[in-house]
């Protein structure tokens, strides 16, 4: 099982996300990543292979990533070998390396679980002009959310709902939308997720 966390509030998100991921560790993960955003700025994605401490060192314990809204992930490889490209977060845009640094993408997300019909969904998205850079089912899931978001223009909740209708599997999902700064959208099916609210700040794990 992978670990996913999210935070939006007044504090800097990255140190909180790293601490949250450390509490979820229970075996040897192969990679980790964060996506953090400050206001209307683009989300910035940082990934690292190896242990969570490698990501912490790469970001100076989160201090090099400015932003009060973000998501994080530790990966145990299922689809795709351990690599920076296969590490989460994944992005909806056709970005080389599947998103690193500031990303222009409409949707950035992390996911825990298995998408059983990801190959079928990937073929659908390829027909609609999407390109893929990782071997993960997560990249397919994020780009499917993007597809419905742009097709129906009805907002994040409707896009995620339509995605869940098409997806088979057990999963938990966290996504951020470029058009909705300071917000994290979550969904789950048969996978655990908890949301906590305290002092006007929101935590997800």
What positions do the PLM features span?
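Conserved short alpha-helical segments that host acidic/polar catalytic motifs at enzyme active sites
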Residues: 1-205
């Amino acid at each position: 099982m992978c670990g996913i966390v999210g935070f939006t509030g007044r504090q800097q998100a990255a140190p909180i996300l790293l601490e949250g991921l450390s509490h979820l560790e229970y075996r040897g993960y192969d990679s980790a990543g964060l996506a953090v955003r400050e206001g209307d700025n683009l989300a910035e994605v940082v990934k690292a292979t190896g242990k969570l401490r490698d990501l912490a060192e790469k970001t100076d314990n989160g201090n090099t990533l400015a932003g009060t809204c973000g998501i994080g992930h530790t990966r145990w490889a299922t689809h795709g070998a351990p690599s920076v490209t296969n590490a989460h977060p994944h992005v909806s845009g056709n970005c080389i390396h599947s998103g690193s640094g500031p990303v222009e993408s409409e949707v950035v997300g992390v996911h825990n679980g298995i998408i059983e019909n990801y190959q079928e969904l990937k073929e659908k998205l390829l027909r609609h002009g999407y390109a893929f850079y990782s071997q993960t089912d997560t990249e397919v899931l994020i780009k499917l959310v993007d597809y419905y978001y742009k097709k129906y223009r009805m907002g994040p909740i409707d896009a995620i709902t339509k995605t869940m209708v098409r997806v088979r599997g057990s999963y938990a999902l966290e996504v951020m939308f470029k058009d909705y700064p300071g917000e994290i959208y979550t969904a789950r099916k048969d996978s655990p997720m908890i949301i906590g609210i305290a002092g006007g700040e929101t935590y997800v794990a």
